[in-house]
Design a protein with these regions (language model features):
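A "functional boundary" signal
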Residues: 1-212
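Selective detector of the "anchor" transmembrane alpha-helix that sits immediately C-terminal
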Residues: 217-223
Length: 223
């Protein structure tokens, strides 16, 4: 629910959950759900005091999560990778991602997630080509599996826009926007709206220029 922007509903469900009665094997799921909720809330709130409050709660639940996870579990590796990246150690994070990627089967939700997170690491390292490569792999997997969270695709669209490839940038962001609205993913609608407007404002004059024969800048595409 939190991933779809249904924060109030997600928070209410977690409030109704009696943590003390949960079996041990469900504790990682509980703490992970809490961590994701407050991470999303901290990202979207416009109030600085609430942002700090949500960030503190997200950190608290992340610490609790790490205490109940097996070090060999995929979620433990994912959280370790995120912590290394946040601490400014992208090379260490990439090494952990190497392990995760080696165990992620293509055309699975795990593969889509691991390749997306790998693209973020390459962004930190300033390796734009590898960032685009793994965004493309993640986006293709999302589409094949009908996953409606298109973070990979609209990030790729933004990169292509910055490189002047308006045709593909517009095509990808429009597809992402249409899918987001179809499934009423409110948080993604907010994220996509800004870059869609920016690309649209550039693309429409570009399209008119092509119609008059004056052409338009277009680069190579990752997809």
């Amino acid at each position: 629910m939190a991933s779809a922007g249904m924060y109030e509903e997600a928070a209410e469900l977690l409030r109704q959950t009696d943590k003390a009665s949960l079996p041990t094997h469900l504790m990682p799921d509980y703490y992970n759900a809490c961590h994701k909720l407050y991470t999303e809330l901290s990202f979207y709130t416009l109030d600085d005091s609430f942002k700090k409050h949500y960030q503190a709660l997200a950190t608290h639940y992340d610490d609790s999560l790490m205490q109940v996870l097996l070090p060999s579990s995929s979620l433990y590796l994912e959280r370790r990778e995120a912590r290394e990246a946040a601490a400014g150690h992208p090379d260490e994070a990439l090494s952990i991602n190497d392990t995760r990627l080696a165990h992620a089967k293509p055309n699975t939700p795990e593969y889509a997630l691991v390749t997306y997170q790998r693209s973020l690491l390459y962004r930190r390292l300033g390796n734009r080509e590898e960032e685009k490569r793994y965004l493309a792999l993640s986006a293709l997997t999302d589409i094949r599996l009908s996953i409606t969270d298109h973070a990979s695709l609209w990030n790729l669209a933004e990169l292509l826009y910055e490189e002047g490839d308006m045709e593909h940038a517009y095509r990808y962001i429009r597809f992402s926007w249409d899918e987001t609205n179809r499934y009423n993913a409110r948080s993604r609608s907010l994220q996509t709206a800004g870059i869609l407007s920016l690309i649209d404002l550039t693309y429409q004059p570009c399209a008119r220029s092509r119609m008059t024969g004056s052409g338009c800048t277009s680069g190579s595409s990752a997809l």
